[in-house]
Amino acid sequence: MQLIGNAAHFVEIKTFHSYCFDLLGRVGNLDEAGDVVKQAAEMINNGEVEPNRISKTVLVIDEAQDMSKDDYALVSALMKTNEEMRVIAVGDDDQNIYEFRGSNSRYLYELTQTEHSRFIEMTENYRSLRHIVDTANDFARNIRQRIKSTPIISMSQEDGEVRIVKLSLIHISEPTRH
């Protein structure tokens, strides 16, 4: 409350699924979660949702590298409906671990390509020791189609130790961007 005052009373923190269940006036459950984001995006695009229910001034997306096609369609619909809305998408294309369920870093990339967007690389790592960060940079340098171009810098004064026991790239796939 001290940081933003009474504006804290107007902050909503929800997953895409929870937000869409609310928009559709339904109580969410796992069995019905499959198409709820897609349905909400279509309803917004078709003008079937009251504007006051979708008017937002700021949309913050955490773990934006994990957006799916339907998630991106929802964000796009909200952006089209709320032209003045600020979108802050935070993500790391090297950490997309949900591709098996349809997520793709390309949607984070697409947000960086929209009009008036600004791309900021956060390159300072306060969590990992230097040798760990250096090893990750060496590995990531060989990944094609990355969004980031600047190596990460460890802010730690400690070197740390890295041991690679076995590296198998059989099941690693690179994201595709169309």
What residue ranges belong to the model's regions?
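Conserved helix-turn-beta segment of the N-terminal RecA-like "Helicase ATP-binding" lobe
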Residues: 1-11
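Conserved small/polar residues in nucleotide/adenosyl-binding loops
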Residues: 170-177
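Ser/Thr-centric signal marking residues that sit
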Residues: 1, 15, 176
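Conserved helicase NTPase motor core
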Residues: 12-106, 124
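Conserved RecA-like helicase ATPase core segment
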Residues: 73-160
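Short acidic-hydrophobic, aromatic-tinged amphipathic segments that line or gate anion-handling sites
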Residues: 163-169
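Conserved beta-strand segments of alpha/beta enzyme cores
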Residues: 10-12, 118, 163
